[in-house]
Regions:
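A short, flexible loop at the N-terminus of ABC-type nucleotide-binding domains that lies
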Residues: 1-25, 30-32, 73-75
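Catalytic Walker B motif of ABC-type/P-loop ATPase nucleotide-binding domains
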Residues: 162-166
Length: 300
């Protein structure tokens, strides 16, 4: 599929003492929801911090919205205001009240919609519309409610790109489902002009809202593509124990018990299993991601 890129990267490299992120080529499609998937320490947050300008001491370059460079992101407020970001660290000062958090954003962002912010705080069950609640401090909120408060902030602005680092992690199952609805509504509101990038290891919970997946292990992209294309590239194989060893050499991932075996196979290699008593299924993104990660990690 041909597509425009909302963010592209070239020769990206960031070194730590015991970790190296190395991505020669990065293309994130415009108008879609892209998931950065990987285990803890794979490099997802490092990549996001580089994208949004939190980390500047790296090699390589980014291009935003097809025309703006890293330097323009830093020096041109109009470019930065097109991007909404939430991270895993402190977004609001702990001593701020909820009312102060609203007031600060009204000062910082010309396009901040205070009424929309209040509506989202209520809709996301962060606060009740009382004076007591408005004077509650950020430090008094649960991790989940702090995340929801960050989401309310970025969704109250007129952005073209949301970059969300692990937004689902502190949320309960119902709120993760709500987050998926919010992302879909955000994308649908601008007919292909808005994009979302988020990192996750809650693959199953976020699959419904993932259009494009980038799987990262040890600081490198090990698989990527539109989810529907990945589901055509791979296929789930199931069979009886008697055929397990014969099938194993073809399978991308493999697990077995007393009753049979299951694994993921590249669809192009399915013919190599001819003659075995097997059944096939379309894989979920979660099955694909776990299999790919297992093939690129010590946790097998």
């Amino acid at each position: 599929m041909n597509y425009e890129s909302v963010i592209s990267g070239r020769d990206l490299n960031k070194k730590y003492k015991d970790f190296n992120l190395n991505i020669p080529d990065l293309e994130i499609p415009k108008g879609f929801s892209t998931a950065l998937i990987g285990e803890n320490g794979a490099g997802k947050t490092t990549l996001i911090d580089m994208m949004v300008g939190i980390k500047l001491d790296y090699k390589g370059s980014f291009t935003y919205f097809g025309k703006y460079s890293n330097t323009e992101l830093e020096k041109n407020p109009a470019v930065k205001e097109r991007i909404g970001y939430t991270g895993t660290g402190l977004y609001y000062l702990p001593q701020w009240t909820l009312k102060q958090a609203r007031e600060v954003q009204e000062l910082l962002f010309a396009d901040f919609d205070g009424r929309r912010y209040d509506e989202l705080c209520s809709e996301l069950a962060i606060t009740k519309d009382t004076a007591f609640e408005q004077n509650k401090k950020v430090s008094a909120l649960s991790d989940g409610n702090r995340t929801k408060l960050m989401l309310a902030g970025v969704l109250s602005r007129q952005t073209d790109l949301l970059i969300l680092d692990e937004p689902a992690s502190p949320l309960d199952p119902l709120m993760r489902d709500k987050l998926c609805d919010i992302i879909r509504s955000y994308l649908a509101s601008a007919e292909g002009e808005r994009s979302v990038i988020f990192s996750t290891h809650n693959i199953a919970d976020m699959e419904a809202v993932t259009d494009y997946a980038i799987i990262i292990e040890h600081g490198e992209i090990v698989e990527q593509g539109f989810v529907e294309d990945l589901k055509e590239k791979y296929i789930v194989i199931k069979g009886e124990s008697k055929d397990a060893e014969a099938a194993r050499k073809v399978l991308y991932s493999f697990s077995s018990n007393n009753y049979g075996f299951e694994g993921l196979c590249l669809a192009e290699r399915l013919d190599e299993l001819a003659g075995l008593d097997i059944s096939t299924e379309c894989p979920s993104l979660s099955q694909i991601a776990i299999a790919v990660m297992k093939n690129n990690t010590v946790l097998r």
